[in-house]
Amino acid sequence: MPTDYHHGARVIEINTGTRPIRTIATAIIGMVCTGSDADVAAFPLDKAVLLTDVRTAIGKAGTLGTLAKSLKAIVDQCDPLVVVVRVADGEGADPQAIADDQTSKVIGTVTGGAYTGMQALLAAQAQLGVKPRILGVPGLDNQEVATAMIPIAQKLRAMGYAYADGCESASEAILYRDEFGARELMIIWPDFVAWNTDTSASEPAFAVARALGLRAKKLRSIPHQLDCGDPYLGSRYV
């Protein structure tokens, strides 16, 4: 048997903060979000950033876009290491053009060695020393984004989570799921409802963000168990 074969979970240690942080290597989240009012120093555009204290990072995430909502959803489940790539809002002359531009910015590209959008997750290990293994783009994961997530998940040996975009029933969600054949992608449906303290009202909450947090929680505690049947904290079903 090779001497370098590893049995069990791998643990990584981050020593860049005031105290070392140890975590299961497979429990690291990689996420792409928008947030036009986020702190640009804490969340630069199209650059992977490692969050070792998600609760503190929420204070720099602003209130617009998907960033703050996604971080809050994750921290409701646990407080894992999260690699975040913030992308700019979509632009265009009409709603369809804006949506298309947003999709392009989320999927990203590699030009002259510069990684943007989801592609920036591929550079996380070289830049940050960690490899995200739980991937998602809460609130922005249409079919094109979900499709583009698959090869990234395969390269990172990760699991991607995406919403059943546009589906209004369980039967539609099942048909949507069947359009993807990759084992690295899990389709989530429906979204939840959660209280927004900024608006003092209930609103739809990203199920994918909660799935990311729950998966990290499970991998840090009982990694061989499935996610199904576990409660999502901080939200309720519609």
Name these PLM-found stretches.
Residues 64-68, 80-84:
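Membrane helical hairpin/interfacial module
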